[in-house]
Amino acid sequence: MGNYRKLWFTLIGVLIVTFSLLGYYGAEVYRTAPPIPDKIATAGGEILYTHDSILDGQTAWQSVGGMQLGSIWGHGAYQAPDWTADWLHRELLNWLDVAAERAHGKPFADIDAAAQAVLRDLMKTEYRTNTYNPETGVAMVSSTRADAIAKTALYYDQLFSEAPALHKTREHFAMKENTLPSAERRAQMMGFFFWTAWAAATERPGTTATYTNNWPHEPLIGNKPTAENMVWSVMSVVVMMAGVGFLVWGWAFLRKHDEADPEPPQHDPLSRVPLTPSQRALGKYLFLIVALFSFQVLLGGFTAHYTVEGQQFYGIDVSQWFPYSLVRTWHIQSALFWIASGFLAAGLFLAPLINGGKDPAYQKLGVDILFWALVVVVVGSFAGNYLAIAQIMPPEWNFWLGHQGYEYVDLGRLW
């Protein structure tokens, strides 16, 4: 270790700094996360949503594919809309219509410009004002907003069911018919969508920006990029480019001597090393890797086709069995699996070479056990994805065995 002491200390120092930053900002994410109110209620005492119903709604959203079907707060697939941005915009338009009917007896589009400006200003104030009370856990909404929420929820209830009026919309969004069959779970999911929109519109205490830092862009309530958005967006690019430039400069000018071109060996060194039992056992890993890679490529074409025909494959309605959210899930997960399996196989192949051409104790047994563990994870997670999106799996099992809905971490938590 003596020759590499400086490098070891450099590596340890880098790890300490980076993991300290990761831990600090990871804790900050939880500390500054938007609160989930115990109740969303009106001044008249009507309870619209509760803490538990919002979380149940999140589970319902995860079970239909989560980020693989639209997105939340901008993180996910965009074949369907971002549900936060879409809900917020629709709710705002509904608020304007409800308020106009109450104040003027006609839709918002039919009142004069001065009256429209007054209602827009009232709406902006109402939506950006934080009515959440941390002591009681209650967030209050006006009766006008409650009616707007109900009208917005009705649209989503029809969208995620099989209402004929929204068939073309579902096709454009690559959603299967009756995406979420249970009316109760659809209502819960609406609560989750509302909460994400509430956080996107409500100002964080002590600031003039919302909990999501004024995301999404929504001119109706003044959601525009903050100064911090602009500064840190530019700074991140500048720092990245400066870092790359420093690395190039350091490599070119800080080295004490040029490295000599390596001389190729006369013979392939691997061909002179007899394979150990554990290395021979790695052959089945290659079949798994090739199978997953082929599966990923085929699913990539299948997924891309859904952008043309949202529910069909060359005229055949396959969405009831293999909807867009499922094949996109499998497409991404199969890529992660074959890449991870390839790294595992490479590392396991090199271990005996590093060990002087001999297998470490129980190496072959470990290779075999790990392979079957991979098979169980792949088959189990794919089956769980299917059963969740098909709404066959019980809701309470979805998180652990079905679909977590986080795009690159879709497999159930147990897997």
Language-model segments: residues:
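Hydrophobic cores of alpha-helical transmembrane segments in multi-pass integral membrane proteins
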Residues: 8-27, 61, 69, 206, ...
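Membrane-interfacial, low-structure loops and terminal tails that flank and connect transmembrane helices
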Residues: 257-282, 358-361
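Membrane-interface interhelical loops and short amphipathic "cap" helices
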Residues: 30-51, 75-79, 87, 95, ...
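Short, charged/polar low-complexity linear motifs in solvent-exposed/disordered segments
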Residues: 88, 97-98, 353-355, 362-364
